[in-house]
Amino acid sequence: MAEALQELAAHVEMRQPDAILGHRIEFGELTLDVAPNRIVGLVEFLRTDARCRFSSLVDITAVDHPERPARFDMVYHFLSMYQNHRIRLKMQVREDETVASIHSVHPSANWFEREVFDMFGILFTGHPDLRRILTDYGFRGHPMRKDFPTTGYTEVRYDEVQKRVIYEPVKLVQEYRQFDFLSPWEGADYILPGDDKART
């Protein structure tokens, strides 16, 4: 399997040299590092090339790395049922950078890209309907970013008296708790039953 993936990587790198920055095989899957300005052309190639035929878009997501200048990793997963392969495309994107939509190649990317926009705030150029898909209309922020507060900014609840949904600032019933302490189990060297036999 690894040999077939290595051959596939060499084929893609040979046919799309400007798009591929590098590759690796991890967990039985091929990962290609992609130049952001080449994503649409590469996805089109992977879908139509006879040796690839990655016709199924499985998922699009992002990973937040706030400490990096290119804050986000955009991650695309594709499946080729014809070749029985999976492939992962990764590209690094700055916070102020837009990403070209692959909706024209894979119409199923529509809702995946909307979800990435909603959760991470990454903008897609050429998307037909880029608006929130999981959060409410007036939602502030992007909840999958690592700098988003775990409590959120507003509390949404249904009010029985007013017979409608109301929005209120978050009110915590207790103070934040600090869990930064050493566990009694960390660093201990316990002798468990049966360990004494292994040492002799």
From Swiss-Prot:
The name of this protein is NADH-quinone oxidoreductase subunit C
This protein's UniProt keywords: Cell inner membrane, Cell membrane, Membrane, NAD, Quinone, Translocase, Transport, Ubiquinone
Q: How does it assemble?
A: NDH-1 is composed of 14 different subunits. Subunits NuoB, C, D, E, F, and G constitute the peripheral sector of the complex.
Q: What is its main location?
A: membrane
Q: Enumerate the GO terms in the molecular function aspect.
A: NADH dehydrogenase (ubiquinone) activity; NADH:ubiquinone reductase (non-electrogenic) activity; quinone binding
Is the keyword Zinc assigned to this protein? no
Q: What is its EC number?
A: 7.1.1.-
Function, in words: NDH-1 shuttles electrons from NADH, via FMN and iron-sulfur (Fe-S) centers, to quinones in the respiratory chain. The immediate electron acceptor for the enzyme in this species is believed to be ubiquinone. Couples the redox reaction to proton translocation (for every two electrons transferred, four hydrogen ions are translocated across the cytoplasmic membrane), and thus conserves the redox energy in a proton gradient.
Return the Pfam families for the record: Complex1_30kDa
Q: How does it sit in the membrane?
A: Peripheral membrane protein
Q: Which gene encodes it?
A: nuoC
Segments forming a coiled coil: none
Q: Which domain of life is it from?
A: Bacteria
**Catalyses which reaction(s):** a quinone + NADH + 5 H(+)(in) = a quinol + NAD(+) + 4 H(+)(out)
GO cellular component, alphabetical, reads:
plasma membrane
User: Has keyword Membrane?
Assistant: yes
Q: Which family does it belong to?
A: Belongs to the complex I 30 kDa subunit family.
Location of the protein in the cell? Cell inner membrane
Give the organism's phylogenetic lineage: Bacteria, Pseudomonadati, Pseudomonadota, Alphaproteobacteria, Rhodobacterales
The record ties this protein, via HAMAP family, to:
NDH1_NuoC
**InterPro entries in UniProt:** NADH_DH_suC, NADH_quin_OxRdtase_su_C/D-like, NADH_UbQ_OxRdtase_30kDa_su, NADH_UbQ_OxRdtase_CS
